[in-house]
Amino acid sequence: MQPDLTDLLHRVRELVARGGRVLGIAGAPGAGKSTLATALVEAWGDGAQLLPMDGFHLADDELARLRRGDRKGAPDTFDVDGYVAALSRVRTHRADVLVPRFDRSLEAAIAGSLRVSVATELVVTEGNYLLLDAPGWRDVRPLLDEAWLLVADDELRVPQLVARHVAHGRTDEAARAWVLAVDEPNAALVAAASGDADLVVRR
């Protein structure tokens, strides 16, 4: 079942009316965070923008140097300090903020490819670890005016996750192995850190 976008959009409008600006959507890999965030921004229209956490992936060369390339997507494979700094600048609402965007066709973040305008009414940021209580990551939650946790049944989420990896070049066997070894441990971290969400959205 898909979340009721009309009800969610109403909640977002109430958030902005109260003076809120930054909405965070957390969830496990494959839960549908990007899809929901994009739908909200498109439904809002002019005045809403995305700020995806995925743009702060460390580069593959850096992951190789740190010997973390075999678990890309884990909390310590992101530039969490850069993400927190970007959110902090967005919250000050004083100037446009340039942020990176993750290009899945390249499996790399492209610096300065998204501009969050100072005039933007609503900024929707989404990612796995927005509610994670860990060094660096615990600084994210205070920067969100509201935080949602998107939850999907594993029977729906895992096959979609495998299909995504296959679509980006992995064999079915390799995709399933990656999901089991990397994505599912990350999903467990997300589930364990869900207590600070203002709203749980199920699909």
PLM feature segments, named:
Residues 1-24, 28:
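Extreme N-terminal, non-catalytic leader segments
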Residues 33:
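Conserved lysine of the Walker
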Residues 36:
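Hydrophobic positions on the alpha1 helix immediately C-terminal to the Walker A/P-loop
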Residues 39:
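Active-site signature of alpha/beta-hydrolase-fold catalytic machinery across serine-
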Residues 42-50:
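Post-Walker A helix-loop "phosphate-sensing" segment adjacent to the P-loop in P-loop NTPases
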Residues 52, 59-106:
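Conserved nucleotide-sensing/catalytic segment adjacent to the nucleotide-binding pocket
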Residues 106-164:
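ATP-dependent NMP and nucleoside kinases share a basic, alpha-helical "lid"
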Residues 112, 135-138, 166-203:
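Small-molecule kinase domains that catalyze NTP-dependent phosphoryl transfer to phosphate-bearing small molecules
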